[in-house]
Swiss-Prot record:
UniProt name for this protein: Venom peptide 3
Renumbered ranges of AXPX repeats: 25-28, 33-36, 37-40, 41-44, 47-50
GO BP annotations listed: defense response to fungus; innate immune response; killing of cells of another organism
Function of the protein: Antimicrobial peptide with strong activity against the fungi B.cinerea (MIC=5 uM) and C.albicans (MIC=33 uM), and no activity against the Gram-negative bacterium E.coli (MIC>200 uM) and the Gram-positive bacterium S.aureus (MIC>200 uM). Shows cytolytic activity against insect cell lines. Has no hemolytic activity against human erythrocytes. In vivo, peptide injection in the vicinity of the head and thorax of lepidopteran larvae induces feeding disorder that lasts one or two days before recovering.
Propeptide residues according to the Swiss-Prot or TrEMBL record: 26-51
Record's keyword annotation contains Ion transport: no
Residue numbers of Leucine amide PTMs: 65
A single cellular component GO annotation: membrane
Molecular functions per Gene Ontology: toxin activity
Species of origin: Orancistrocerus drewseni
Phylogenetic placement of the source organism: Eukaryota, Metazoa, Ecdysozoa, Arthropoda, Hexapoda
């Protein structure tokens, strides 16, 4: 490897490290739940009548996949 190649590789590594440092410094956005999923987010909602529909759908999918 020539000196020029080594210098180019070092500058590329420094640039990559600087970019990674900038990316990790920015906080990740908070995930936003879909409006339809929000009623099922708390434990009390699992016992609600609306949750029965969700349970029926999940059970049907699992049965279609051959699981109980």
């Amino acid at each position: 490897m020539t000196k020029q190649s080594i210098v180019i590789v070092l500058f590329a590594a420094i640039a990559m490290m600087a970019c990674l440092q900038r990316v990790t410094a920015e906080p990740a956005p908070e995930p936003i739940a879909a409006p339809i999923a929000e009623p099922y987010a708390n434990p009390e909602a699992i016992a609600s009548p609306e949750a029965k529909d969700l349970h029926t759908v999940v059970s049907a999918i699992l049965q279609a996949l051959g699981k109980k």
